[in-house]
């Protein structure tokens, strides 16, 4: 998909020169003094003759604008405050037809909690949270932020893209030191998926640029033919027209009506079924969100001309912009910085980013001076490996006390037997087979620190959910194609768990509660190849093995698309490679060493090497690897055993933002690449909520790391200490 109307960005590979306004410390100081001297950029200030504030041409349809008083409702907590975010979910007055206000409130509640641990014992309210101010001080307030929210679609006029962009402009926006933080949604979430990262910006009186990057939580229900609108409310497909946030299109061989008749009760999700390969455009979407936010800032705070028109007072030349977010959003921020040819972005601060290196990157990753078994694989490559082996590997004797180790039950034992029968692992017993599967994962690049996560990731169907959604996305498949015999539906009662009509209340609330990548609220993966008819994937039977083995046939089919170089899939994958060129911008990446979803050997470690190789001496990227950190802070103090093992990575995402901001504002040097050695809180494997965390559990990033903690790069070889 070609991006249109991108006046300040293009699909650059970043090898050219950047706009001369890119900040160094002196330029920042001069700009700050100049702004202060003219009294800021308020309605009576002088921002220069920059012309009228013109809405970006890529905005399609109306712009929704709402102001929040910071009491009954607000930008950060939707009026819930710090305590409300940690409490039970707010109720809908009519669960079958929640209002837009209710959906927004619950989306903020659910998405905030999905990203951070909201238990006080885990650090909420003391190390982070709405009541912890920009300087880290714990206040007695609720952390509500008054301001104005702007929301709109970007599209080419067809209504097929309809990427949501949103700007939150706090009333306290610092017009003398203007700043914007991007917070692109993580995972496949909707536009509020980056709210926990956006919190940092709001606390620093920055505007925040959000986008759902062409994904989203609410589906097209094919049975009722209803679709989500931008505010999460639902409408018939015909009634929504081009204002549908997502409406599925049929494939080449079947109409939607025909598909719905032969395959009833199915749901289409935007990331999987938009046929747009959204990931190819995540960088461009993030740049659009920043441009939209610049327009919104000017709409609220730009100088007013004599004719009453707002002026484009705030521009890339005088607004500090940091691209931030985590996971897929972090990858989008990096892509945006690589593709930014218009000088929008000044720095990057991301956590656990999904970054894919081209096959020709030539980067070598070492740990403790020894080359790792594998590095630099693409997300689809390593995830389809995980989808095959993690379920069996979770039964290794060394992992008997891992979180959810006993949850998978017979499916895990059968997966081991099926893999052994297909000569994919060795061993004549489940124990030996599990050890062989675990070895296969280590050979594929997982660090041993990730081992304890395999059982819970398998039980939660993480590998299968990502493999299915991304296979469809990369191949630009339609919902009617049922790639590898998978579909999405609400499950009936077990043990059959056949497709049924989605419960009305669950469907109505999915904009708020869903994650956009089934299994999610009341929706699961269906194995349409199950011998007795479509059935929940995890409990289904594989035709080739006649075992309930978590659908090994489906996992092999998804892997086979890569192994056979399926043309559509390979084209889509080829559109997601990063260049490594951040244009010399000050940048910090943080990631947990234990990350079992996006392994460090395939993401941040090799990206550091690629960046240093491409940029050479101009590189200003620091990589911070955190021991005892993993991908899902939201699981800590929720899944028994996580609190014992893992620290909150959100603390280090905030510290990365602090470091980049201090560098851009004050010239404070970035911390060098290093390993930060944390201390888990401890407790028992059966503890859901662990002992209270202390600051000593999460030490700061060192300005000068010890020699044994320094990460080094020589040429394109990265060496991470043990």
From Swiss-Prot:
Compartments reported by the entry: Secreted
The EC number(s) this enzyme carries: 3.1.1.22
Example of a GO cellular component annotation carried by this entry: extracellular space
InterPro entries per the UniProt record, alphabetical: OHBut_olig_hydro_put
Catalyzed reactions per annotation: (3R)-hydroxybutanoate dimer + H2O = 2 (R)-3-hydroxybutanoate + H(+)
Pathway participation: Lipid metabolism; butanoate metabolism
HAMAP family given in the database record: 3HBOH
Record's function text: Participates in the degradation of poly-3-hydroxybutyrate (PHB). It works downstream of poly(3-hydroxybutyrate) depolymerase, hydrolyzing D(-)-3-hydroxybutyrate oligomers of various length (3HB-oligomers) into 3HB-monomers.
Homology family: Belongs to the D-(-)-3-hydroxybutyrate oligomer hydrolase family.
Annotated protein name in UniProt: D-(-)-3-hydroxybutyrate oligomer hydrolase
Species whose genome carries this gene: Cupriavidus metallidurans (strain ATCC 43123 / DSM 2839 / NBRC 102507 / CH34) (Ralstonia metallidurans)
């Amino acid at each position: 998909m070609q991006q249109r109307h991108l006046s300040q960005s293009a699909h650059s590979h970043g090898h050219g020169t950047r706009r001369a306004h890119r900040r160094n410390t002196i330029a920042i100081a001069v700009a700050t003094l100049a702004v202060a001297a003219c009294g800021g950029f308020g309605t009576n200030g002088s921002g220069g003759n920059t012309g009228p504030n013109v809405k970006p041409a890529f905005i399609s349809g109306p712009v929704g604008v709402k102001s929040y008083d910071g009491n009954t409702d607000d930008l950060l907590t939707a009026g819930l405050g710090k305590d409300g975010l940690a409490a039970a979910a707010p109720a809908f007055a009519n669960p079958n037809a929640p209002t837009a206000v209710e959906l927004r409130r619950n989306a903020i509640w659910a998405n905030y909690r999905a990203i951070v641990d909201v238990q006080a014992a885990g650090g909420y309210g003391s190390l982070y949270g709405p009541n912890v101010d920009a300087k880290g001080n714990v206040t007695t307030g609720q952390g509500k932020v008054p301001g104005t929210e702007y929301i709109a679609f970007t599209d080419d006029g067809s209504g097929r893209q309809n990427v949501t962009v949103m700007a939150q402009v706090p009333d306290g926006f610092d017009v003398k030191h203007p700043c914007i933080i991007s917070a692109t949604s993580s995972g496949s979430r909707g536009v509020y998926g980056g709210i926990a990262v956006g919190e940092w910006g709001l606390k620093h009186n920055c505007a925040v640029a959000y986008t759902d990057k062409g994904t989203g939580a609410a589906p097209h229900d094919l049975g009722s033919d209803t679709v989500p609108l931008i505010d999460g409310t639902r409408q018939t497909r015909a009634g929504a027209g081009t204002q549908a946030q997502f409406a599925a299109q049929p494939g080449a061989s079947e109409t939607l009506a025909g598909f719905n008749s032969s395959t009833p009760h199915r749901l289409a999700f935007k990331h999987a079924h938009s046929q747009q390969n959204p990931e190819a455009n995540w960088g461009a979407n993030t740049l659009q969100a920043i441009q939209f936010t610049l327009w919104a800032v000017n709409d609220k705070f730009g100088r007013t001309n004599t004719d009453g028109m707002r002026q484009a007072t705030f521009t890339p030349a005088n607004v500090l912009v940091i691209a931030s977010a985590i996971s897929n959003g972090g990858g989008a921020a990096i892509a945006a910085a690589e593709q930014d040819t218009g000088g929008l972005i000044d720095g990057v601060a991301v956590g656990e980013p999904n970054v894919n290196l081209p096959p020709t990157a030539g980067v070598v990753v070492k740990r403790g001076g020894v080359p790792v078994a594998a590095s630099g694989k693409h997300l689809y490559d390593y995830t389809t490996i995980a989808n095959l082996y993690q379920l069996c590997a979770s039964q290794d004797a060394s992992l008997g006390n891992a979180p959810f180790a006993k949850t998978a039950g017979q499916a895990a034992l059968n997966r081991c037997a099926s893999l052994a029968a297909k000569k994919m692992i060795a061993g004549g017993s489940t124990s030996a087979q599990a050890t062989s599967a675990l070895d296969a994962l280590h050979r594929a690049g997982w660090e041993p620190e990730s081992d304890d996560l395999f059982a819970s990731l398998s039980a939660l169907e993480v590998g299968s959910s990502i493999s299915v959604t991304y296979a469809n996305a990369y191949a630009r498949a339609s919902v009617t194609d049922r790639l590898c015999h998978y579909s999405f539906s609400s499950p009936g009662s077990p043990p059959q768990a056949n497709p049924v009509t989605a419960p009305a209340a669950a469907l109505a609330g999915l904009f708020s509660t869903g994650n956009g990548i089934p299994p999610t609220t009341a929706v699961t993966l269906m194995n349409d190849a199950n011998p007795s008819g479509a059935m929940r994937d995890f409990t289904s039977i594989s035709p080739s093995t006649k075992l309930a083995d978590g659908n090994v046939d489906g996992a092999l089919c998804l892997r086979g698309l890569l192994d056979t170089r399926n043309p559509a899939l390979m084209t889509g994958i080829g559109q997601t490679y990063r260049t490594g060129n951040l244009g010399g911008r000050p940048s910090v990446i943080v990631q947990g060493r234990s990350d079992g979803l996006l392994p460090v050997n395939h993401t941040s470690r090799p990206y550091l090497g690629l960046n240093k190789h491409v940029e050479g001496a101009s590189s200003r990227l620091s990589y911070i690897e955190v021991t005892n950190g993993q991908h899902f802070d939201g699981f800590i103090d929720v899944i028994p055993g996580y609190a014992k093992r893992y620290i909150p990575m959100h603390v280090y995402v905030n510290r990365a933002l602090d470091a980049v901001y201090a560098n851009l504002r004050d010239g404070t040097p970035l911390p060098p690449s290093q390993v930060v050695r944390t201390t888990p809180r401890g407790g028992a494997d059966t503890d859901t909520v662990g002992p209270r965390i202390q600051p000593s559990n999460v030490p700061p990033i060192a300005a000068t790391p010890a020699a044994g903690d320094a990460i080094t790069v020589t040429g394109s070889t990265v060496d991470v200490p043990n």
